[in-house]
Amino acid sequence: GNECIGCTMKLYGNEDAGISRAHTCCSLDDVEDARSVAHRLGMPYYVFNFSDDFRATVIDKFVDSYLHGMTPNPCIDCNRYMKFGKLYERAKILGCDHIATGHYARIEYRDGKYLLKKAVDPSKDQSYVLYAMTQDELAHTLFPLGGMCKTETRRVADEGGLINADKP
């Protein structure tokens, strides 16, 4: 076991308040679900407001690239600058040695190097949006879902009594 904290990155305003969660992601309901899961697991839970950084480093870049005829993938920049940039820095300030995310990918240490590997479940693999991770980031990241299929993830969550076991 590890000593864990839970967190959500607030990346934009709450314009989705009152909208069905089927039509949005990262809604206020999702934040409350995450808080409930953290509480059930006995972990402290935080919401980190990175909305200004997200707009400047992900959204504005995406819009500019799109306007110049490119087809950008904002997930790559979000992972690079937000999860493994801002969140990793905040985690270090809080005394965390690692961050763990729900990405379906794996990390292997071999011959003195960390290798980013595809998830066991090829239909859920997300390693392609993590290609920009540095050796330091890989050394301090855990992908606990990478060795599981989605059905197994749901089963474990259900057995743990987590309210989000059936969430899409």
Please annotate each region the language model reported.
Residues 154-168:
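Anionic-ligand-binding alpha/beta catalytic cores of soluble enzymes and soluble regulatory domains
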Residues 1-132, 142, 151-153:
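ATP-dependent adenylation/nucleotidyltransferase module used to activate substrates
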Residues 134-137:
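His/Asp/Glu-rich metal-coordinating catalytic cores
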